[in-house]
Amino acid sequence: MTHCCSPCCQPTCCRTTCWKPTTVTTCSSTPCCQPSCCVSSCCQPCCHPTCCQNTCCRTTCCQPTCVTSCCQPSCCSTPCCQPICCGSSCCGQTSCGSSCCQPSSCAPIYCRRTCYHPTSVYLPGCLNQSCGSSCCQPCCRPACCETTCCRTTCFQPTCVTSCCQPACC
């Protein structure tokens, strides 16, 4: 590990969102790392709300794995637990819920709780198709690195073509 987001007291990732920091020994006060089930000794956690680091740990996967590309649901090994999804043919659900396991075979299906139009008019519910140019997809928390996305945390959602960060709003 070469870098940890502040605060950090060791190169081995001493921070509140570090996963499985078994080698941290010199934290200043209370233990500043929390254990989890990441496969490596200390995965660099995703910097919410987006993760585009060289190494990160997908917290939205059923089995968190370290990946080397921008963190998207497709990075996870199947099945991948997405925070919001709706695919009756894949998940066995007919409506959007808080979470559901969607196999990678369902990748072409995009379904979100809210889909934003460029005019900021929103359509509640799910769309069983890709939004395309007429509708921006909301960011998939905790990461969003889609080609086109719509910041759901903005008062006026706008389409951006780069990784979704607060500065995009």
Swiss-Prot record:
It comes from the Eukaryota. Coiled coil: none annotated. Belongs to the KRTAP type 9 family. It holds the Pfam family Keratin_B2_2. In the hair cortex, hair keratin intermediate filaments are embedded in an interfilamentous matrix, consisting of hair keratin-associated proteins (KRTAP), which are essential for the formation of a rigid and resistant hair shaft through their extensive disulfide bond cross-linking with abundant cysteine residues of hair keratins. The matrix proteins include the high-sulfur and high-glycine-tyrosine keratins. Sequence repeats lie at residues 8-12, 13-17, 32-36, 37-41, 46-50, 51-55, 56-60, 61-65, 75-79, 80-84, 85-89, 90-94, 100-104, 139-143, 144-148, 149-153, 163-167. The gene is KRTAP9-7. It comes from Homo sapiens (Human). The keyword Metal-binding does not apply. Keywords: Keratin, Repeat. GO terms for cellular component: cytosol; keratin filament. Residues 8-167 are annotated as: 17 X 5 AA repeats of C-C-[VGSREQH]-[SQTPN]-[STPAI]. Interacts with hair keratins. This is Keratin-associated protein 9-7.
